[in-house]
Structures are given as C-alpha cells and as structure tokens.
C-alpha cells in the first residue's frame, strides 16, 4: 500500500488529503500537525475549518484510509510521499520584511524529514513558495539525510478557492506537477501523477520543471488579484461619472479574450494568498533587478488598499462626516462567503477605519466566532505603505466592537449597515424590519453589491453600492479619497 503523509492540517492540507483518500481507497493518507488541538478537531464532528462538502468526505474516509495524527515523525518516516503544506507568511522583520515569504516552517519541516527518513521519499511542495525554494530544500535534505536515503522534490501547487475547495479538488481545471528533468525526477513526477489519474483526466495533469511550477502559482494568484483591482479601479471611475460598474464589467466580460470571472467590484480582496503572494512576487522581482516589474505588481496591492480606504471614507462622509459614537452594523467578517477564513479580510481594515473614527461597531458573520474577530482586530501586521487606519488597534479601541448572533441584532439601533461579505442570507434579509429598528436617516453601504439598492431606497434607506451611480444624498456629501 502506498503511504502518503501531509505535514499541515490547515485549509489546504486537510481538504486535499481528504479527497485523495476518497478517490484512492487503497492508499493510506495521514495528515499530521504539531497542534494537538487541531488534530483533535479533525478527529471530531466539529472540523476546524468550514468548507461545503468537507464534512461528508471526511466522514466517509476517516478511520478507513484517512487518519489525523500529532505523531508527526512516525508518519513522516513511514510515508512514501510527503506533502508539505505548512504556513509561509510574509516576513515581519529582517531582510525582506513586509514582502518576502517566511520559510521558517518549511526549513524546519525539511530538517525533520531528513532526520527521520530511513527510506527514499518524494517530498511535495504544496504550500505556495518562492521560485527556487525547491533548490534550497534539496540542499537541506541532501546535507542532513542518512547515507543511502534519496529525496526527490516536486512542486504541486494548489489552485483551490475557499468555499468551493472540494468541488475544485474533485474536478480541477488542471493539476500542475513540477520536477527535476532527470530520470529520478521523472519517476517521482510519475508516482504523483499516478495518484491524481485515479480521478483527474490525464490531459488536465500538466508537468513542468520545478521553477515553472513554483512561479506558476504566484503568477496565477497575481493575475486573479490584478483582475479584482482592475474592476475596483473602474468602480471608482464609475461612481465619478455615473456609469454602473456591473454593466461595464458585463460588457467587458462578454469579450471572449477577457471572460467574465473575477470582475465583481467589491470592497477589496482578502484571503491568505493574494496579498502575500503578490508581495512575495514583488520581492522576487526586486531581488532579480526588475524594479519596474516589481512596481507594476505593487500597484495591485495599492489599489486594494485604496478601495478599502475609499469605502471607509464614503461611510464617514455620508454620515455628516463623523461616525463618532454611532453604531455601525457590519454584516460579514470572513473574506468571502462559504468560509470562516478571516485572513487578510477587508472587514478588518474597514472596522479599524470606523473604530479609528470612534464608531461603535457591531459585527455578525454566520461562520466567524467572537474570539476570532477580537484576535484579528488586535493582531499587529507589518506596515507596508498602508494608510494609518490599517495599523494595529489598542485594547481600548477593541472594546468599541461587539459581536451579534444575527443580522437583526447587529443592526438594532444602528445608524448604518456595512455589508462586507456576500453571504447568501444577506440577500434575503427583511430589510423593512431592519429599517424600522435603526436610527434615521438609515444607511446601507453595500461593499459586495448583494442587495437591490432601489428596493432598499423605497423602504427609506440611503444606499451606497460600490461602482453604482450615486443618489442625490451621496453626491452632496462627496467622499474624500
């Protein structure tokens, strides 16, 4: 029986291994993590991450050929193929701080693999890593491994979207495998390919050299984020000219050379990948003497920050240029619907901006806990040309935040409602009921364009929708960028 071990039981490692176990019942799959609490959650009925369809896949495979364990060294030592899906955050200090990927966890994983391996291993990069990381990992493994034990490094980046991860894994657009162009490297690529061909058509499995695979993941995320920043830049121009960004995006998306995906204007992109990977790409360009290319990609982040700042400014300016002492309901805190992931969510920066103007913020999200909200708002992060309101908040300021159990409670007695995540339930709320319980004039600031603005105006709301023509009230109170 082929044995697979995955280091890291997070948003990538857990779902990916669960689907491999589902589709390869004769392969033993073990997910390991140094966090005993996380492993306990994977072994319970309350999984540590929310992902549609994940519960069912885990339930069908767990205890059969899918296992979760904190006995890391044992299972790594027994495995034929070791996936490494550990965190690669942006460095917070030192050389490359604010841009470069921090490979501390990756290096620790490589040293541990070298120490415990008594047989040949195929080591698979699943985390998103900088170009040439495989070369560094090879050196660590070769210099620290036992005599006679061989290692082959593969790059097999994930192309998952949170909220649709199981669907993406079951029917991927493509599976990318990069390896050394040697006999041993090609054999390792084939071994991993044999796993995926159990359910993925062979024509969708792409093989490249290591460096192309590593860079392809960064490039894919950069291109997707670029599209979001492009349509968000257009949303600002639409508001200034009276155009409708939804109509513009639809017209542009009908061009077969462009396509319609990732053209929804919003308060900004978030998640664990886009900003981190673009900053990493910027750093790689700078290190390779390509400042013009670095500056090009840096603008994607700058537009994203601008969009969040613009949203906050619109809220404040619309409400008589102050939100001090006013209750603002925030509907949605996760970075997108159908996930509880709050990493780099635009809601953090919007909330900080409102609280910085002394607003009282009441937050509701169906999948985000109060503890998570408080942790996110208190967390420090590296300042990289960010506006002041994106800085860490003081404990005193965080006391201005409350978390509600539903949207109606969050909006009760509020002056304004900010919709920051496109949860389906926010489309069908009883907005007449919400309006009745709010201070007047009552505002809705739709950061995801999920509500019917005209229907809300008929109820009595003053409505701001990103990239849509402004009503008279908003025109009279222009937001300062």
From Swiss-Prot:
It catalyses: UDP-alpha-D-glucose + 2 NAD(+) + H2O = UDP-alpha-D-glucuronate + 2 NADH + 3 H(+). Disulfide bonds: none annotated. GO terms for molecular function: NAD binding; UDP-glucose 6-dehydrogenase activity. Keywords: NAD, Oxidoreductase, Phosphoprotein. Pathway: Nucleotide-sugar biosynthesis; UDP-alpha-D-glucuronate biosynthesis; UDP-alpha-D-glucuronate from UDP-alpha-D-glucose: step 1/1. One of its GO terms (cellular component) is nucleus. Coiled coil: none annotated. The active site is at 273 (nucleophile). Its EC number is 1.1.1.22. Pfam families: UDPG_MGDP_dh, UDPG_MGDP_dh_C, UDPG_MGDP_dh_N. One of its GO terms (biological process) is glycosaminoglycan biosynthetic process. It comes from the Eukaryota. Substrate binds at residues 158-162, 217-224, 257-270, 335-336, 448. It is an enzyme of class 1 (oxidoreductase). The modification Phosphoserine is found at residue 394. NAD(+) binds at residues 8-13, 33, 38, 86-90, 127-128, 162, 273-276, 343. Belongs to the UDP-glucose/GDP-mannose dehydrogenase family. This is UDP-glucose 6-dehydrogenase 1. It comes from Oryza sativa subsp. japonica (Rice).
């Amino acid at each position: 029986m082929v044995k697979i071990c995955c280091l890291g039981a997070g948003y990538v490692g857990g779902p990916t291994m669960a689907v491999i176990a589902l589709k390869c019942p004769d392969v033993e799959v073990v997910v390991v993590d140094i966090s005993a609490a996380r492993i306990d959650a994977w072994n319970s009925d309350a999984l540590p991450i929310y992902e549609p369809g994940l519960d069912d896949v885990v339930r069908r495979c767990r205890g059969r050929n899918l296992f979760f364990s904190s006995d890391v060294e044992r299972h790594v030592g027994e495995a034929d193929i070791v996936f490494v899906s550990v965190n690669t955050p942006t460095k917070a200090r030192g050389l490359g701080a604010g841009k470069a990927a921090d490979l501390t966890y990756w290096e620790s994983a490589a040293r541990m693999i070298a120490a415990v391996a008594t047989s040949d291993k195929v080591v698979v990069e699943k985390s998103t890593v900088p170009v040439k990381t495989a070369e560094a990992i090879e050196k660590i493994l070769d210099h620290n491994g036992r005599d006679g034990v061989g290692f082959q490094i593969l790059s097999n980046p994930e192309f998952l979207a949170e909220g649709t991860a199981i669907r993406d894994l079951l029917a991927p657009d493509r599976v990318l495998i990069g390896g050394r162009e040697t006999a041993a490297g090609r054999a390792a690529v084939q071994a991993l390919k044999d796993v995926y061909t159990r359910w993925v058509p062979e024509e969708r499995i792409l093989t490249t050299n290591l460096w192309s695979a590593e860079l392809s993941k960064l490039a894919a995320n950069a291109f997707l984020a670029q599209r979001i920043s492009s349509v968000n830049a257009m949303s600002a121009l639409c508001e200034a000219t009276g155009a409708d960004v939804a109509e513009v995006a639809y017209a542009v998306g009908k061009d077969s050379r462009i396509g319609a995906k990732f053209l929804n204007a919003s308060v900004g992109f978030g998640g664990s990948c886009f900003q981190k990977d673009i900053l990493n790409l910027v750093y790689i360009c700078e290190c390779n003497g390509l400042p013009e290319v670095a500056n090009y990609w840096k603008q994607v982040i700058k537009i994203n920050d601008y969009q969040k700042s613009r949203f906050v400014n619109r809220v404040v300016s619309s409400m008589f240029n102050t939100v001090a002492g006013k209750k603002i309901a925030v509907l949605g805190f996760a970075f997108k619907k159908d996930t509880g992931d709050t990493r780099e969510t635009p809601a953090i920066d919007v909330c900080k901006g409102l609280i910085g103007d002394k607003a009282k913020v009441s937050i509701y999200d169906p999948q985000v806990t109060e503890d998570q909200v408080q942790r996110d708002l208190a967390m420090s992060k590296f300042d990289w040309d960010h506006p002041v309101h994106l800085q860490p908040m003081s404990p005193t300021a965080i006391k201005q935040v409350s978390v509600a159990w539903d949207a109606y409670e969050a909006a009760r007695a509020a002056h304004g409602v900010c919709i920051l995540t496109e949860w389906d339930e926010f489309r069908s709320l009883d907005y007449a009921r919400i309006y009745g319980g709010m201070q007047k004039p009552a505002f809705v600031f739709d950061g995801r364009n999920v509500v019917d603005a005209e229907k809300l105006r008929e109820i009595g709301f003053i409505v701001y929708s990103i990239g849509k023509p402004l009503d008279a009230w908003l025109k009279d109170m222009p937001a300062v960028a």
